[in-house]
């Protein structure tokens, strides 16, 4: 591990990239309160600070199913154009304020149709809000490129419909696809037709795997479904019996040697019980073993976090250096679902010069 360290204030200004971040898990607490009032939805509290604390405490159950259940209140205020436009616009502005220069936001449009919008209308509305946010961020001198990953919910039957929308909107801001939701009992291969369709249409996709479920979910996501990245993937360590020795099993070696990005989310993993502490989170050992690990927030409201906070935690509790942070930032951009020239420009023109200035 390199020796150069960094203070938090400098860290806030460094360019960042986030690949795994859910739109409905990242609303501002004040926005949830205001939108809930406008649609008549009852919240646990109407005080924004208390609501933020409620989310964080409710998510700290150590159980993925309970963690997911906290989304009911954010989803309740994202069922019309007003809520979707505001959530999307503020999403971009919040990333820009956090120093993020590239982000991929994911959401499942089927979860936003209770107010009468079609899935297509949901996608159109979110893209409109994201475009507004990017224009405002650029005008403020903090440009950020945000691409969309459409999600299918693995426990429901509209995954193929979401995949069709990813194909339809791939030239209109949608850069890829994912399936989300409870892993146990809902293997990704249940939706193989959707993944085969995406592959035929040359649309990249990631799959949530290796979080609540173990190696079989990672193997199936990669070798059966053909995922280009893995969402979370912390359980890949089950195929590395001795992390210190670094002897890899066949699946772990495949992931490392083929440079398959792991979208790791330390704070979220602590909340769902997928990891025990920041200091012992597998991201550090996997980074040191040469895996293409990336650092992510997952759900900024639910986890009470930002990219700056995630980086700070790794610096303070896992001994990370600025070189380590640069590595995972470059890793994320190398594995982003946008064209090669865009990724290269962000790495060479934005990220590397900024990190060089503090080394």
From Swiss-Prot:
The record marks 232 as: Important for catalytic activity. The keyword Hydrolase applies. Belongs to the metallo-dependent hydrolases superfamily. Adenosine and AMP deaminases family. Adenosine deaminase subfamily. Substrate binds at residues 22, 24, 181. Its cofactor is Zn(2+). It comes from the Bacteria. Catalyzes the hydrolytic deamination of adenosine and 2-deoxyadenosine. Keywords: Hydrolase, Metal-binding, Nucleotide metabolism, Zinc. InterPro entries: A_deaminase, A_deaminase_dom, Ado/ade_deaminase, Metal_Hydrolase. Disulfide bonds: none annotated. Zn(2+) binds at residues 20, 22, 208, 298. GO terms for molecular function: 2'-deoxyadenosine deaminase activity; adenosine deaminase activity; zinc ion binding. It comes from Streptomyces coelicolor (strain ATCC BAA-471 / A3(2) / M145). The gene is add2. Binds 1 zinc ion per subunit. This is Adenosine deaminase 2. Its EC number is 3.5.4.4.
